[in-house]
UniProtKB/Swiss-Prot annotation:
The keyword Metal-binding applies. It comes from Serratia proteamaculans (strain 568). GO terms for cellular component: cytoplasm. It is an enzyme of class 2 (transferase). The lineage of its organism: Bacteria, Pseudomonadati, Pseudomonadota, Gammaproteobacteria, Enterobacterales. This is Thiamine-phosphate synthase.
């Protein structure tokens, strides 16, 4: 893991609603619906198969002046000038963090326990994601859910960092998550599997950011 001596560029302390989606189509829909922080997460495909989609998503993010993070594909994120990159713990050892830093991109890092939190803090990221908070079907997780007590404990020690809670957060759980002091709530199925994604997005924006 590359030693980083200066912090990655800052993001707002409260990133608000943070949908994580797997297609440019979802990026376009959510930007049009007023979302300003979001992540494109396409998994396990060669760079040449995803570059067009990543470039298109980044262009959309710039058009809407949004904070678009690219999951994993850091070289393409640098090439096309993304707002930021999001990495899992398993990516920290294999990614050229210094290259991301030199390019001026923001960095978000996933964490699941105290040891991973320490690793994340060591690279001085722009934000730290804490999860998974509740059981989730969206992604296979080797760790147990953190729950609200652990979330609150972790956030209490991260006052210098923007924080993002992720994992199994449905609309009816948002208020309890926010009460833990987190600055952002990441969602997947709460939007993508909602019977009416527009209504769900509007409700989440109102709950998390106070947007009508």
């Amino acid at each position: 893991m590359t030693d980083i001596t200066t912090p990655f560029p800052a993001t707002p302390h409260k990133l608000g609603l943070y949908p994580v989606v797997d297609s440019v189509e979802w990026i376009a829909r959510l930007l049009d619906a007023g979302v300003t922080t979001l992540q494109l997460r396409i998994k396990d495909l060669p760079d040449e198969q995803v570059e067009d989609d990543i470039a298109a998503a980044i262009a959309l993010g710039k058009r809407y002046d949004a904070r678009l993070f690219i999951n994993d594909y850091w070289q393409l994120a640098i090439k096309h000038g993304a707002y930021g990159v999001h990495l899992g713990q398993e990516d920290l050892d294999t990614t050229d963090l210094a290259a991301i830093h030199r390019a001026g991109l923001r960095l978000g890092v996933s964490t699941h326990d105290d040891s991973e939190l320490a690793r994340a803090i060591a690279v001085k990221p722009s934000y730290i994601a804490l999860g998974h908070i509740f059981p989730t079907q969206t992604k296979d997780m080797p760790s147990a859910p953190q729950g609200l007590v652990e979330l609150k404990r972790h956030i209490a020690g991260l006052s210098d960092y923007p924080t993002v809670a992720i994992g199994g957060i449905s609309i009816d759980r948002v208020a309890a998550v926010l009460d833990c002091g987190v600055g952002s709530v990441a969602v997947v199925s709460a939007i993508t599997q909602a019977p009416d994604w527009r209504a769900a997005t509007a409700q989440l924006l109102q709950l998390i950011e106070g947007k009508e």
